Amino acid sequence: MKFTSVLAFFLATLTASATPLYKRQNVTSGGGTVPVIITGGPAVSGSQSNVTTTTLFNSTSTLNITQLYQIATQVNQTLQSESSSGIIIVTNWRSIETLSFFCSIVFNTSKTIVITENFLWGVPILSSSDAEGRGTLVAGRDKVVYSGVFPPYTVPVGVLSGQKNVQWFFDACEPTLIASNSTIRTQYSNFTSAQISSNASSGTNTSSSSSSPLVPIIYEEGYSQSLIQSLSSSIQGLVVVSSGTSHNSTVASWTSVDFPVVYASDGSSGHDGSGIGFISNTSIPQGAISAGYLSPIQAQTLLSIAIHNQVTSSSELQQIFPVSQQ
Ligand SMILES: *[C@@H]1O[C@H](CO)[C@@H](O)[C@H](O)[C@H]1NC(C)=O
Ligand SMILES: *[C@@H]1O[C@H](CO)[C@@H](O)[C@H](O)[C@H]1NC(C)=O
Ligand SMILES: *[C@@H]1O[C@H](CO)[C@@H](O)[C@H](O)[C@H]1NC(C)=O
Ligand SMILES: *[C@@H]1O[C@H](CO)[C@@H](O)[C@H](O)[C@H]1NC(C)=O
Ligand SMILES: *[C@@H]1O[C@H](CO)[C@@H](O)[C@H](O)[C@H]1NC(C)=O
Ligand SMILES: *[C@@H]1O[C@H](CO)[C@@H](O)[C@H](O)[C@H]1NC(C)=O
Ligand SMILES: *[C@@H]1O[C@H](CO)[C@@H](O)[C@H](O)[C@H]1NC(C)=O
Ligand SMILES: *[C@@H]1O[C@H](CO)[C@@H](O)[C@H](O)[C@H]1NC(C)=O
Ligand SMILES: *[C@@H]1O[C@H](CO)[C@@H](O)[C@H](O)[C@H]1NC(C)=O
Ligand SMILES: *[C@@H]1O[C@H](CO)[C@@H](O)[C@H](O)[C@H]1NC(C)=O
Ligand SMILES: *[C@@H]1O[C@H](CO)[C@@H](O)[C@H](O)[C@H]1NC(C)=O
Ligand SMILES: *[C@@H]1O[C@H](CO)[C@@H](O)[C@H](O)[C@H]1NC(C)=O
């Protein structure tokens, strides 16, 4: 099972950002350093020259949307002030999927953003020539480099071939979802803002009056009508993990709820366990939106970014998810 709990909440309180977000530590000085942002994951001992680390948090659980935007703000500042070809973000294993997808959507940059559990695995990527223009990448323990647009460890794009080198499998190119002519880039240019909105952006007043949307993930088999009713006043969106081929939804229609509902496939029905599935817009209840090939966590991340930018109508959301893009 991919999820440790049935409900994975993005919690709602936006903590005051007036407190210092990070502490900076000089690992080395001089030119040619690789910027590293630490948000969790195991501490790496041993000296590594040419690395400048900034510690934001030391989280052991899945990063929430507030933390993701805090990271984005820091990444944006760092990328603008450094001459490096990119940046490494170290995080815990639970957060790899949401962080790599979040960065793929939010950053429209030719610099490379490497998400990893251990910065040592990421350094060769940024040292390699030809690292730019590849978007967000995930560096795995196995020395393989994966695309950040797909669930981690599913779509390899290169392999480490030395201390400073990567053998890339493809020329640098843009994934369709976020290509420069994609719907997300052309019509939702506000998604590529790393700024934490300073005022409440949720359309409805919630008890916490926060700008961080709550978008839980539930399993199609695992919920009851009363659970949804008890949640409905406190959530801004919902991701339902489709039970797969045997479609036996307990809900025939979602047209009566006032938050967006996205159905996603967890890809576990695939023989090869690739972790990528597809759910078409014809096999979901009325009023719901299909996530296409996005995983449940990716759907949650994209929906949270959309809601953060006040994009909540079905017609708009349908264009964003990769199901009707032809
Ligand atoms: C996000 O997680 C941090 C650390 O666990 C927590 O302090 C904060 O309150 C959370 N924020 C939200 C919006 O849930
Ligand atoms: C980090 O290095 C820079 C340049 O070498 C230096 O100016 C700065 O004082 C150092 N900062 C710390 C905290 O050591
Ligand atoms: C890394 O640091 C070493 C010395 O610690 C230096 O010789 C080398 O040129 C540096 N490499 C880069 C790419 O800056
Ligand atoms: C994060 O905290 C854990 C303990 O909770 C500790 O073992 C680890 O070294 C810390 N990581 C960093 C980078 O400080
Ligand atoms: C984007 O451009 C490519 C060619 O560069 C084209 O094949 C594709 O159809 C375009 N997509 C959209 C949505 O316009
Ligand atoms: C993305 O970056 C390209 C090149 O820098 C730029 O032309 C385009 O307008 C940017 N798109 C968005 C949505 O910011
Ligand atoms: C990065 O920060 C600059 C200002 O410091 C801002 O103009 C720019 O829009 C930010 N970029 C993103 C992606 O938020
Ligand atoms: C929220 O921010 C926007 C600009 O980002 C501004 O136009 C709007 O007036 C603000 N709303 C409130 C209630 O402050
Ligand atoms: C939303 O909250 C504001 C102040 O927090 C209040 O003035 C307004 O009446 C509320 N709107 C609704 C629809 O509850
Ligand atoms: C739906 O559920 C009913 C009874 O629970 C069962 O008889 C039927 O075969 C199911 N349909 C599918 C497609 O699984
Ligand atoms: C972001 O862009 C979309 C599409 O243009 C628009 O509908 C939405 O209102 C924008 N969000 C904000 C907060 O301006
Ligand atoms: C499903 O998406 C296709 C485009 O791929 C569109 O033509 C069709 O109307 C959509 N169907 C529904 C039920 O939304």
Curated annotation (Swiss-Prot):
The keyword Glycoprotein applies. Residues 1-18 form the signal peptide. The program of events of meiosis and spore formation reflects the sequential expression of at least four temporally distinct classes of sporulation-specific genes, SPS100 and SPS101 genes define a distinct class of very late sporulation genes. Serves a protective function during the early stages of spore wall formation, and contributes to spore wall maturation. Residues 19-324 form the Asparaginase/glutaminase domain. The keyword Signal applies. This is Sporulation-specific wall maturation protein. Induction: Induced at very late stage of sporulation. Keywords: Glycoprotein, Signal, Sporulation. To yeast YGP1. GO terms for biological process: ascospore wall assembly. SUPFAM superfamilies: Glutaminase/Asparaginase (SSF53774). It comes from the Eukaryota. InterPro entries: Asp/glu_Ase-like_sf, Asparaginase/glutaminase-like. Glycans are attached at N26, N50, N58, N64, N76, N108, N181, N190, N199, N205, N248, N281.
